[in-house]
Amino acid sequence: MLSAASQVLLRSEELLEQGKWLLVNPTDGHVFSALSNPEVYGFHQFFDIYEQSIASAKAQGRDTQHQFVAAYDTDASFDGAVLYLPKAKAHGQMLLANIVACLKPGGTLLVVGENKGGIKSAAKLLTPYSDNVNKIDSARHCAMFAAVVDKPVASFDITKWQDVSEHQVADISFKVCSLPGVFSHGELDTGTQLLLDNIDRVVSGRILDFACGAGIIGCFAGLKNPQAQVVMSDVSALAIYCSQKSAELNGVKAQVIPSNGLGALTGKFAQVFTNPPFHTGIKTDYSVTEGFMQQLKNHLQDRGSLILVANKFLRYADELDKQFKSVQTLTETTKFSVYCCRR
């Protein structure tokens, strides 16, 4: 079933029937098959929807006109674009700056999203690019706005949106590159710092920073033990980009892999570290972390370990007890718990 935002978009499908269009971060991959125009391309920053879109296109016998990237190539030239509004305002602003640079003069911008996700602010987000912004639909607790790009458009450079911050935990100093839309943008969040404070030892084997965000844990581990073989993974193209940049800034050699959960990862790990997500967009979603905990034992070496930090209210301890022989609480505060689990 299509997401509510995609259902609202399809109510105005006639707007997309002509010309070359770009769908930006659609919330499901099947919307492309529901559109009659074959000249609809996908710009994806989330690997799960990217994979879903590719699979759907192949099943329909369509060309796979999809890219999983942090920023879309502005050499492209589209008649229109549809932005599925992201949760973070700054992320939406960055995406719009990228998208308008991909449009032909006088191109059309559509922004669709849920009421709870801040879609009512879309008109303000569009005003830097258009004097002609209109709300054209409202249904299924969503809304859609349309604008014609009639103001001058600047070139887009993702590096201008980057934030580089410096941090020190224990005796290790490190730099972090982050972008809007990446977890804890521009900051070292309290939970991650608590996890870092409780990493006594990093082994010289293969280690994983799961749901790596800006790559903080992976870079810290690589600096703590330069002999470690660091792997970082995330579902977000922005996180992949930032983790690669963070690794470069710190001189850490790391393999950074886009993955929906553990699906794209091969081989086994001696240590796994994570501050796992519990949101998908604006919705609370425990499925990613629960799936990770259930599958991880197949990716851990004998006597391998997991160190995980989580908000105390998430109650992950019971699931960890089911999946691991040994579960130890390393430390806890009023907000967070850090667990060490072994096969």
From Swiss-Prot:
SUPFAM superfamilies: S-adenosyl-L-methionine-dependent methyltransferases
Catalytic activity line of the entry: guanosine(1207) in 16S rRNA + S-adenosyl-L-methionine = N(2)-methylguanosine(1207) in 16S rRNA + S-adenosyl-L-homocysteine + H(+)
Enzyme type, top EC level: transferase
Main localization of the protein described in the UniProt heading: cytoplasm
Cellular component, GO annotation: cytoplasm
EC number: 2.1.1.172
Gene Ontology molecular-function annotations: 16S rRNA (guanine(1207)-N(2))-methyltransferase activity
Keywords: Cytoplasm, Methyltransferase, rRNA processing, S-adenosyl-L-methionine, Transferase
Subcellular location: Cytoplasm
Metal-binding keyword on record: no
Record text on subunit structure and interactions: Monomer.
Entry function: Specifically methylates the guanine in position 1207 of 16S rRNA in the 30S particle.
Similarity comment text for this entry: Belongs to the methyltransferase superfamily. RsmC family.
Name used for this protein in its record: Ribosomal RNA small subunit methyltransferase C
Name of the gene: rsmC
